[in-house]
Regions:
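Gly/Ser/Thr-rich active-site loops/lids in small-molecule metabolic enzymes
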Residues: 14-15, 19, 86-92, 121-148
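A generic, well-ordered mixed alpha/beta core segment in the N-terminal half of proteins
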Residues: 2-61, 66-68
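Short acidic, glycine/serine/threonine-rich loops at helix termini
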Residues: 6, 78-81, 119-126
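Flexible, glycine/charged-enriched surface loops at secondary-structure junctions
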Residues: 24-37, 99-111, 135-146
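Conserved phosphate/anionic-ligand binding catalytic regions in large, soluble enzymes, centered on
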Residues: 1-5, 104-120
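Internal alpha/beta scaffold segment
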Residues: 15, 75-104
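Active-site-proximal helix-loop elements at catalytic-domain edges
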Residues: 61-89, 147-150
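Conserved small/polar residues in nucleotide/adenosyl-binding loops
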Residues: 152-158
Length: 159
């Protein structure tokens, strides 16, 4: 990897400064929803820091940054299921959705990570939210693999 930047700060420190700058900007329409210490005094930081930062080092000299500006409230709907090999993934997901109840801000989008350890599955679920899926096109042409079949089974009625 041949990538350098002129700073003595860590990646996390630079990202946190960027998040603070963005959330404190007068034109920012997003709500600050991160607390300093979730266990004791739940005081809002008012700048959505500290940010959650995942770093993946790959060969080359390019830098690719994906940003999800979301509050911690979206984590309130997170579900982790450790399934047995005989369990049906689609049945599990469809069984969990009604338990989520109200309280999520539209649009409701599910990120699903399958396989690996618990922490890896949760990261995969977050990363899946960056993928583009045209569900109407998928339904029209039909699924081409097992993952696409799962997408069509997970599509919920709109009424």
């Amino acid at each position: 990897m041949d990538l350098r930047w002129d700073s003595d700060k860590t990646i996390e420190e630079m990202v946190n400064q960027g998040v603070r700058n963005a959330y404190l900007d007068k034109g920012n329409p997003l709500r600050a929803s991160i607390v300093k210490n979730p266990i004791s005094e739940r005081i809002n930081t008012k700048d959505n820091s500290p940010a959650v930062v995942h770093v993946s080092l790959v060969p080359g000299s390019d830098l690719d940054i994906s940003i999800a500006a979301k509050g911690a409230g979206s984590e309130n709907k997170a579900v982790l299921g450790m399934l047995n090999p005989s369990d049906n993934i689609v049945d599990f997901v469809l069984g969990e959705i009604p338990k989520m109840g109200a309280g999520w801000c539209p649009p409701g989008v599910l990120g699903i990570g399958i396989g690996g350890t618990a922490d890896k599955a949760m990261i995969m679920a977050k990363e899946s939210l960056f993928e583009t899926i045209d569900i109407q096109e998928l339904k029209k042409r039909g699924p081409s693999n097992k993952i696409a079949v799962s997408y069509t089974h997970l599509t919920l009625p709109t009424n």
